[in-house]
């Protein structure tokens, strides 16, 4: 092998190659709003339970149950880990990751000291994840699997909605609050106070 590499080097023959994957059968007509923009879809469902202190805006994520479609799993442990990671990343996006700029337009929340991402202690006390069974990808993918890196990110909306409904409890669920993301304790408390004022008016 070393002789072959040496000879290729001397003769200036490249021993590596580069290529790009092009997803087949996707197209989109922007003018008509029709087409097939994705090769396949991944589906998931999540239900989350929170406890919200309506006097402080602080909350605890008690429980989340997730069912996710990964097609035919290649490795159940890896798929579950990807779902956990995507979900918790999404929880951070919707509950703690806040962007602030100074008067000159410079980002102030640019480091771990100012940009708050979830910790291990922010995971739900109970986190149940199940993979949808008997649902191979109808497309001819590797062993009929589906990508599972990014799709679970959106399952965190269940936490945001649980917090929104918990805030609505102060007015006996009579209205759906206009809760802004991220649902920090401060934003939750402001939302709760606004709901109370509207209810008293």
Predicted regions and their residues:
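C-terminal catalytic domains of large/alpha subunits in multi-subunit enzymes
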Residues: 1-201
């Amino acid at each position: 092998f070393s002789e072959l590499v040496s000879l290729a080097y001397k003769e200036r023959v490249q021993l590596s190659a580069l290529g790009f994957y092009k997803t087949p059968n996707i197209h989109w007509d922007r003018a008509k709003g029709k087409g097939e923009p994705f090769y396949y879809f991944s589906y998931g469902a999540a239900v989350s339970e929170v406890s919200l202190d309506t006097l402080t805006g602080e909350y605890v994520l008690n429980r989340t149950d997730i069912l996710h479609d990964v097609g035919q799993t290649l490795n159940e442990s890896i798929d579950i880990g990807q779902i956990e990671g995507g979900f918790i990343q999404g929880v951070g996006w919707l509950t703690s990751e806040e962007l602030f700029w100074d008067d000159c337009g410079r980002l102030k929340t640019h480091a771990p000291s100012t940009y708050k991402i979830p910790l291990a202690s922010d995971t739900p006390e109970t986190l149940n994840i199940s993979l949808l069974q008997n649902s191979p990808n109808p497309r001819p993918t590797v062993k009929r699997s589906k990508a599972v890196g990014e799709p679970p990110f959106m399952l965190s909306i269940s936490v945001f909605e649980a917090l929104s409904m918990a805030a609505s409890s102060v007015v006996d669920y009579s209205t759906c609050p206009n809760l802004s993301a991220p649902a920090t304790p401060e934003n939750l408390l402001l939302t709760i106070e606004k709901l109370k004022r509207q209810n008293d008016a």
